[in-house]
């Protein structure tokens, strides 16, 4: 996949400034196109990474009980409005066959998936599917909580409203007690 085209973004931002009635040569916004291009390269850096790559680092550990990394902060950009949404992801899995990954690898996977024009639902399911595919655990549960600026700044204008999405895979799909246990761990501060 091609890298971010900074010049093209700069040109587009100048056009947006003109389209809203601003002067792109005005002192306060003169460097805005360059700043926005640089920001987009960072914010959308996940476009050029395979999130599964982070999960391939495994440790041969005979642990087949729950592993939960909770409150992983993330930010993303709504693909519908190109405004931010941000929150936390909680990633739980039950390892199988000695395939335990580093805890930071779960956080890196979330970041890589989130750093692209995205939907919260897709982040949630892609994290779960990536873990299932690479680590082949007994089960996975991903819970994502986020506030969407497209609901805060425009439209319905409801600051503070949180959206919660879940993805459950493997043995956890049919184990309500295990899902409840994971949710209770997530709620515990």
UniProtKB/Swiss-Prot annotation:
Q: Tell me the SUPFAM superfamilies matching this sequence.
A: Tetrahydrobiopterin biosynthesis enzymes-like
Task: Mention one GO biological process in which this protein takes part, according to its record.
Answer: tetrahydrobiopterin biosynthetic process
Would I find rRNA processing among this entry's keywords? no
Q: What class of enzyme is it?
A: hydrolase
Provide the reaction this enzyme catalyses: GTP + H2O = 7,8-dihydroneopterin 3'-triphosphate + formate + H(+)
Q: Which PROSITE patterns match?
A: GTP_CYCLOHYDROL_1_1 (PS00859), GTP_CYCLOHYDROL_1_2 (PS00860)
In which pathway does this enzyme or protein participate? Cofactor biosynthesis; 7,8-dihydroneopterin triphosphate biosynthesis; 7,8-dihydroneopterin triphosphate from GTP: step 1/1
Its keywords, alphabetically, are: GTP-binding, Hydrolase, Metal-binding, Nucleotide-binding, One-carbon metabolism, Zinc
Q: Where does Zn(2+) bind?
A: 78, 81, 150
Q: What is its EC number?
A: 3.5.4.16
GO CC terms: cytoplasm
Q: Please give the Gene Ontology molecular function terms for this protein.
A: GTP binding; GTP cyclohydrolase I activity; zinc ion binding
Kindly give the InterPro entries that the UniProt entry links to this protein.
GTP-CH-I_C/QueF (IPR043133), GTP-CH-I_N (IPR043134), GTP_CycHdrlase_I (IPR001474), GTP_CycHdrlase_I_CS (IPR018234), GTP_CycHdrlase_I_dom (IPR020602)
The record's section on NCBIfam families has:
folE (TIGR00063), PRK09347.1-2 (NF006825), PRK09347.1-3 (NF006826)
Q: How does it assemble?
A: Toroid-shaped homodecamer, composed of two pentamers of five dimers.
Family under the similarity heading: Belongs to the GTP cyclohydrolase I family.
Q: What is the recorded name of this protein? A: GTP cyclohydrolase 1
């Amino acid at each position: 996949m091609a890298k971010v085209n900074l010049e093209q973004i700069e040109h587009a931002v100048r056009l947006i400034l003109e389209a809203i009635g601003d002067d792109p040569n005005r002192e306060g916004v003169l460097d805005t196109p360059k700043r926005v291009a640089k920001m987009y390269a960072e914010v959308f850096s996940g476009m050029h990474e395979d999130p599964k790559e982070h999960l391939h680092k495994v440790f041969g550990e005979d642990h087949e009980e729950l592993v939960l990394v909770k409150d992983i902060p993330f930010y993303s950009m709504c693909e519908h409005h190109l405004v931010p949404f941000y929150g936390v992801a909680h990633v739980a899995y039950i390892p199988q066959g000695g395939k335990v990954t580093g805890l930071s690898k779960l956080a890196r996977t979330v970041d890589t998936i989130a750093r692209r024009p995205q939907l919260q639902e897709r982040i949630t399911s892609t994290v779960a599917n990536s873990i299932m595919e690479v680590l082949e655990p007994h089960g996975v549960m991903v819970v994502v909580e986020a506030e969407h600026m497209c609901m805060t700044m425009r439209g319905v204008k409801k600051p503070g409203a949180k959206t919660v999405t879940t993805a459950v895979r493997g043995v956890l799909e049919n184990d309500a007690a295990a899902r409840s246990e994971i949710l209770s761990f997530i709620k515990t501060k």
